[in-house]
Amino acid sequence: MATLESRLAEMLKVPVEALGFQLWGIEYVQAGKHSILRVFIDGENGINIEDCANTSRQVSAVLDVEDPISTEYTLEVSSPGVDRPLFTAEQYAAYVGEDVKVQLTMPVAGSRNLKGAITKVEGQMLSLNVNGKELVVALDNIRKGNVIAKF
């Protein structure tokens, strides 16, 4: 069975791309009565507030018709930002050599939180250099992953 996020991504990909943007990813966070649906978009020239507002209107219209979420939620549309979340193998592969932090469902090397440089991505497996040690993590074990911004 597909996750809610994957069903939403499938539903929203075409309308977002029709506006000229890439659907970077989706997060749905249930927090009691105040759930949040975050839709991340990206574009060749970046994203501005007007892009987010236009995309929000389009996404909201699709969600109103399809009604995939039965509870109340707040819709947020934004750029992934400098500490962008990573959702797919392709996104992780694009950041080989960069530092990331990942939160895991099941511990690897005794930890559910890892920080390290991506050394490679093969299929659905991510290799990280964590404090000089090579660790391999299945992408489906990653609850959340983000690029660590360098300033």
Curated annotation (Swiss-Prot):
Q: State any GO BP term from the record.
A: translation
Query: Which key words tag this protein in UniProt?
Result: Cytoplasm, Ribosome biogenesis
Q: Is the keyword Manganese in the record? A: no
What GO terms fall under cellular component here? cytosol
Entry keyword annotation includes Cytoplasm: yes
Subcellular localization, as worded in the UniProt entry: Cytoplasm
Q: Which residues form a coiled coil?
A: none
Domain of life from the UniProt record: Bacteria
Q: What is its main location?
A: cytoplasm
> What job does the chain carry out?
Required for maturation of 30S ribosomal subunits.
Name recorded for this polypeptide = Ribosome maturation factor RimP
